[in-house]
Amino acid sequence: MKKQRNLRSMAAQAIEQVVEQGQSLSNILPPLQQKVSDKDKALLQELCFGVLRTLSQLEWLINKLMARPMTGKQRTVHYLIMVGLYQLLYTRIPPHAALAETVEGAVAIKRPQLKGLINGVLRQFQRQQDELLAEFNASDARYLHPSWLLKRLQKAYPEQWQSIVEANNQRPPMWLRVNRTHHSRDSWLALLDEAGMKGFPHADYPDAVQLETPAPVHALPGFEEGWVTVQDASAQGCMTWLAPQNGEHILDLCAAPGGKTTHILEVAPEAQVLAVDIDEQRLSRVYDNLKRLGMKATVKQGDGRYPSQWCGEQQFDRILLDAPCSATGVIRRHPDIKWLRRDRDIPELAQLQSEILDAIWSHLKSGGTLVYATCSVLPEENSLQIKAFLQRTADAELCETGTPEQPGKQNLPGAEEGDGFFYAKLIKK
């Protein structure tokens, strides 16, 4: 049976679920994409990601174009108009087609009586586009970030906040990790070249390759065979600091979806790895990654604050703690983060990180290494978190990453084309 649905209305409903109900786009989008034809999957993703990336602008424009906001059962129409505006501003879809499909979306969401309103608002925008955009570009909304986050970035990075914001608003590059147990990076790059694609090696991370143009994973040489994995370069940097060795007992805590678990096993295939995550659903992706790469690890569901519940008194040679965080370093990859996070989340996350660090430290052997990592750019979750931990933990010593006054290494979004990421390497005396 042919799959045929109104993509604009589907995108509007997905965006509404993110903004109004706090649902993650990575949970909402895949089931929706199963309902449309293969050729429409990419457009549905573009509409959802694009609207969430530029939501501040689209909201600002609607407030200028409409006397009253849409509320109640008509709220989905508000997001449908956003989808229409996004197409007119940012896509190559011919304006007449963008308008027609968006207006028709009102029928799909059972609001056919509002077709005229949607058409009128979008046509009004076309007439006033130049003057509206000039006014918008002089407003604070042009940064496309919620005000609470903008204030935190300005405080933490008085010289760099604008470049962080600009990087967050870009489309991310596609980074891959070559499985060194199958191929050297150079030999896999040669296979990529034979397949008619270009890739570039990262200067610092030995397995990392950036694709010149993002591609579907099934087009990548050996993806199904486990020769290559999609993983941002900054996330791959964790292995530089962890430096896992064969024969060691290694804990990957907060492990889902398993990208770092499998990287540990690529670097040290004879290591004994325990992968733990609190989210049982996301652990299924750890199993999937291990299966595709043909690797074995022990996988458990567990809360990082209570390690004795899932590992007893076990001690580890190395621990990778990829701590739960605000994810403010990966906004370009997950633009819904801007609208899912709240200012009050930051102290709550910092408290959780602190509790996990304290709990897991007793399970690290003397002389062992713990790498604390986040995909955040906020000091409360990163340098300040580690500074406080070092002050209260007599047998913890910072190694290779920063100074006791400014602990850790902070990668900012877009630096060397990678995501925003923080690492601190700690040794137990």
Curated annotation (Swiss-Prot):
Keyword set, alphabetical order: Cytoplasm, Methyltransferase, RNA-binding, rRNA processing, S-adenosyl-L-methionine, Transferase
Main location as per UniProt: cytoplasm
PANTHER family noted in UniProt: NOL1_NOP2_SUN FAMILY PROTEIN _ ANTITERMINATION NUSB DOMAIN-CONTAINING PROTEIN (PTHR22807:SF61), NOP2 YEAST -RELATED NOL1/NOP2/FMU SUN DOMAIN-CONTAINING (PTHR22807)
Annotated positions binding S-adenosyl-L-methionine: 254-260, 277, 303, 322
Active site: 375 (nucleophile)
Signal peptide: none
Native species: Escherichia coli O81 (strain ED1a)
GO process annotations (BP): regulation of DNA-templated transcription; rRNA base methylation
PROSITE patterns assigned to the protein according to its UniProt record, in alphabetical order: NOL1_NOP2_SUN, SAM_MT_RSMB_NOP
Annotated Gene3D superfamilies: Helix hairpin bin, NusB-like, Sun protein, domain 3, Vaccinia Virus protein VP39
Top EC group: transferase
Protein name: Ribosomal RNA small subunit methyltransferase B
Cellular component per GO, a single term: cytosol
Single GO MF annotation: RNA binding
Cell location: Cytoplasm
Taxonomic lineage from the root: Bacteria, Pseudomonadati, Pseudomonadota, Gammaproteobacteria, Enterobacterales
Task of the protein: Specifically methylates the cytosine at position 967 (m5C967) of 16S rRNA.
Reactions that this protein is recorded to catalyse: cytidine(967) in 16S rRNA + S-adenosyl-L-methionine = 5-methylcytidine(967) in 16S rRNA + S-adenosyl-L-homocysteine + H(+)
EC assignment: 2.1.1.176
Domain of life: Bacteria
Family, per entry: Belongs to the class I-like SAM-binding methyltransferase superfamily. RsmB/NOP family.
